Amino acid sequence: MAKQSMKAREAKRAKLVAKFAEKRAALKVLISDVNASEEERWDAVLKLQALPRDSSASRQRNRCNQTGRPHGYLRKFGLSRIKVREACMKGEIPGLRKASW
């Protein structure tokens, strides 16, 4: 189990990403606009750098919904490989079964 503080930190990051998503996207469009002046683009870069570090989507870490485990995360299920295996063995995931050949 992940520490509660780690889960809380990830939740805080998710809120920040959602809060600043539009502003961050607008600044990135302005930065990549070749028709904008160099000064406008540079101002946009400075404004982007001034945003909170945790508002970047790449700072988020996928974690298991049940345990908070950061490694072995399977996006399709939102769980770690261990919890997917446990659920599979109990028959809780429809259509998923142990491989046999």
Swiss-Prot record:
Where does it sit, as one GO cellular component term?
A: small ribosomal subunit
Instruction: List the Pfam families.
Output: Ribosomal_S14 (PF00253)
InterPro entries reported for this sequence: Ribosomal_uS14, Ribosomal_uS14_bac/plastid, Ribosomal_uS14_CS
Q: Which GO terms describe its biological process?
A: translation
Instruction: Give the record's subunit note.
Output: Part of the 30S ribosomal subunit. Contacts proteins S3 and S10.
What PANTHER family would the database entry show?
30S RIBOSOMAL PROTEIN S14, SMALL RIBOSOMAL SUBUNIT PROTEIN US14M
Give the family per the record.
Answer: Belongs to the universal ribosomal protein uS14 family.
* Protein name as it appears in the record: Small ribosomal subunit protein uS14
What is the source species? Answer: Aliivibrio fischeri (strain MJ11)
